[in-house]
Protein backbone atom coordinates (compact mmCIF):
# COMPACT_ATOMS: atom_id res chain seq x y z
CA UNK A 1 0.00 0.00 0.00
CA UNK A 2 1.59 3.26 -1.11
CA UNK A 3 0.51 6.73 -0.11
CA UNK A 4 0.03 9.38 -2.75
CA UNK A 5 1.23 12.93 -2.40
CA UNK A 6 -2.43 14.01 -2.28
CA UNK A 7 -3.07 11.75 0.72
CA UNK A 8 -0.06 13.14 2.58
CA UNK A 9 -1.23 16.66 1.74
CA UNK A 10 -4.72 15.82 3.07
CA UNK A 11 -3.36 14.46 6.35
CA UNK A 12 -1.14 17.54 6.69
CA UNK A 13 -4.20 19.74 6.18
CA UNK A 14 -6.11 17.80 8.88
CA UNK A 15 -3.16 18.32 11.24
CA UNK A 16 -3.04 22.01 10.27
CA UNK A 17 0.50 21.66 8.95
CA UNK A 18 1.64 23.91 6.16
CA UNK A 19 4.05 21.89 4.02
CA UNK A 20 6.08 23.07 1.06
CA UNK A 21 6.19 21.06 -2.14
CA UNK A 22 9.63 19.74 -1.15
CA UNK A 23 8.29 18.68 2.27
CA UNK A 24 5.38 16.87 0.62
CA UNK A 25 7.75 14.95 -1.63
CA UNK A 26 10.09 14.09 1.24
CA UNK A 27 7.31 12.99 3.63
CA UNK A 28 5.58 10.95 0.93
CA UNK A 29 8.84 9.12 0.22
CA UNK A 30 9.61 8.59 3.91
CA UNK A 31 6.11 7.41 4.81
CA UNK A 32 6.08 5.00 1.87
CA UNK A 33 9.43 3.58 3.02
CA UNK A 34 7.99 3.04 6.51
CA UNK A 35 4.86 1.37 5.11
CA UNK A 36 7.00 -0.82 2.84
CA UNK A 37 9.07 -1.95 5.82
CA UNK A 38 5.90 -2.68 7.83
CA UNK A 39 4.58 -4.72 4.90
CA UNK A 40 7.79 -6.76 4.84
CA UNK A 41 7.45 -7.39 8.59
CA UNK A 42 3.91 -8.69 8.00
CA UNK A 43 5.41 -11.43 5.83
CA UNK A 44 7.59 -12.84 8.62
CA UNK A 45 6.69 -16.19 10.16
CA UNK A 46 6.17 -15.50 13.86
CA UNK A 47 4.12 -18.54 14.87
CA UNK A 48 6.91 -19.85 17.16
CA UNK A 49 7.70 -16.43 18.66
CA UNK A 50 5.93 -15.71 21.96
CA UNK A 51 4.13 -12.37 22.20
CA UNK A 52 6.12 -9.76 24.11
CA UNK A 53 5.53 -6.23 25.28
CA UNK A 54 9.20 -5.43 25.98
CA UNK A 55 12.41 -6.87 24.63
CA UNK A 56 13.93 -6.83 28.11
CA UNK A 57 12.07 -8.19 31.13
CA UNK A 58 11.14 -5.14 33.21
CA UNK A 59 9.32 -5.56 36.49
CA UNK A 60 8.27 -2.40 38.34
CA UNK A 61 11.60 -0.62 38.13
CA UNK A 62 11.14 2.23 40.60
CA UNK A 63 13.34 4.21 42.89
CA UNK A 64 12.96 4.08 46.65
CA UNK A 65 10.33 6.49 47.92
CA UNK A 66 12.14 8.78 50.31
CA UNK A 67 11.78 12.27 51.68
CA UNK A 68 14.72 14.55 51.00
CA UNK A 69 15.20 17.87 52.77
CA UNK A 70 14.23 20.83 50.64
CA UNK A 71 15.60 24.34 50.53
CA UNK A 72 14.62 26.77 53.29
CA UNK A 73 11.76 29.12 52.48
CA UNK A 74 13.94 32.19 53.08
CA UNK A 75 16.44 31.08 50.42
CA UNK A 76 13.64 30.34 47.96
CA UNK A 77 11.93 33.74 48.23
CA UNK A 78 15.24 35.63 48.48
CA UNK A 79 15.38 35.98 44.69
CA UNK A 80 11.70 36.85 44.26
CA UNK A 81 11.01 40.35 42.91
CA UNK A 82 8.29 40.72 45.56
CA UNK A 83 7.58 38.67 48.68
CA UNK A 84 4.98 38.88 51.43
CA UNK A 85 4.90 36.76 54.60
CA UNK A 86 7.28 34.21 53.08
CA UNK A 87 5.26 33.79 49.87
CA UNK A 88 5.79 35.02 46.31
CA UNK A 89 3.76 38.13 45.58
CA UNK A 90 2.46 38.22 42.02
CA UNK A 91 0.21 40.65 40.15
CA UNK A 92 -3.52 40.03 40.42
CA UNK A 93 -4.84 38.40 37.25
CA UNK A 94 -8.60 38.37 37.75
Curated annotation (Swiss-Prot):
InterPro entries xrefs: Asp/Glu-ADT_sf_sub_c, GatC
Keywords on record: ATP-binding, Ligase, Nucleotide-binding, Protein biosynthesis
Keyword Ligase: yes
E.C. designation(s): 6.3.5.-
GO MF: asparaginyl-tRNA synthase (glutamine-hydrolyzing) activity; ATP binding; glutaminyl-tRNA synthase (glutamine-hydrolyzing) activity
GO biological-process terms attached to the record: glutaminyl-tRNAGln biosynthesis via transamidation; regulation of translational fidelity; translation
Signal peptide: none
Catalysed reactions listed for this entry: L-glutamyl-tRNA(Gln) + L-glutamine + ATP + H2O = L-glutaminyl-tRNA(Gln) + L-glutamate + ADP + phosphate + H(+); L-aspartyl-tRNA(Asn) + L-glutamine + ATP + H2O = L-asparaginyl-tRNA(Asn) + L-glutamate + ADP + phosphate + 2 H(+)
Gene3D superfamilies, A to Z: Glu-tRNAGln amidotransferase C subunit, N-terminal domain
Family: Belongs to the GatC family.
Complexes and interactors: Heterotrimer of A, B and C subunits.
General function of this protein: Allows the formation of correctly charged Asn-tRNA(Asn) or Gln-tRNA(Gln) through the transamidation of misacylated Asp-tRNA(Asn) or Glu-tRNA(Gln) in organisms which lack either or both of asparaginyl-tRNA or glutaminyl-tRNA synthetases. The reaction takes place in the presence of glutamine and ATP through an activated phospho-Asp-tRNA(Asn) or phospho-Glu-tRNA(Gln).
Protein name from the UniProt record: Aspartyl/glutamyl-tRNA(Asn/Gln) amidotransferase subunit C
Gene label: gatC
